[in-house]
Amino acid sequence: LTVRPPYTLEDMAKDALGVLDALEVDRAHIVGVSMGGMVAQRVAIAAPQRVLSLTSIMSSSGARGLPEARRDVLRVLLKRPASSEPQAVVDHYVRLFKAIGSPAYPVPESDMRERILRGVERSFHPVGTLRQMVAIISDSSRAEQLARIKSPTLVLHGRADPLVPFAHGEDTAKRITGARLVGFDGMGHDLPPEPVALML
């Protein structure tokens, strides 16, 4: 069964290049996190002459045969909030962020709830989230195309990532000539302040 998403990761890469065009930026440092890392890879593949450097964070090459997300995490990810009421949505995302978060850098639940509520109040668009998931699932593997990337590349990945396991970062780095891989002990599929400070 072939899934045709409303938009693809390649479409998102074209949008990113369109933003650079609109800003009259010829070349840029391209950074992407999770799905954004996949889009950043697509940008570097499609327009290598526009990329000063590539940083792919907790992302994947899309190669087949890599370890899958933990099943308990997938169950939480694929579950829907009990209702569209803000409190139910916050409860859902608290469960999700606890499931994918960094075991070495736990976030107090009160802080997590406050941050999630601000995000929900600013913009909650579950159909858009679903479209993004479909775009990821339907994207072809970038594995063979990554060899075309010649820009300096940094691959950053949590060693405790339960959603996109560390092996995905290792695979991405080995496929890009000269790429440097940095793993962070105890970091899951989020961006705790301590590892982020080291990234910067």
What role is predicted for each listed range?
Residues 159-164, 189-190:
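Acidic catalytic loop of the alpha/beta-hydrolase fold
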Residues 149, 155-157, 161:
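Short beta-strand/loop motif that positions the catalytic acidic residue
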Residues 29, 52-55, 147:
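Residue in the alpha/beta-hydrolase core beta-strand immediately N-terminal to the catalytic nucleophile
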Residues 32-36, 40:
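Gly/Ala-rich beta-loop-alpha elbow adjacent to hydrolase catalytic centers
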Residues 10-28:
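Conserved acidic catalytic loop of the alpha/beta-hydrolase fold
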Residues 45, 52-84, 128:
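Flexible "cap/lid" loop of the alpha/beta hydrolase fold
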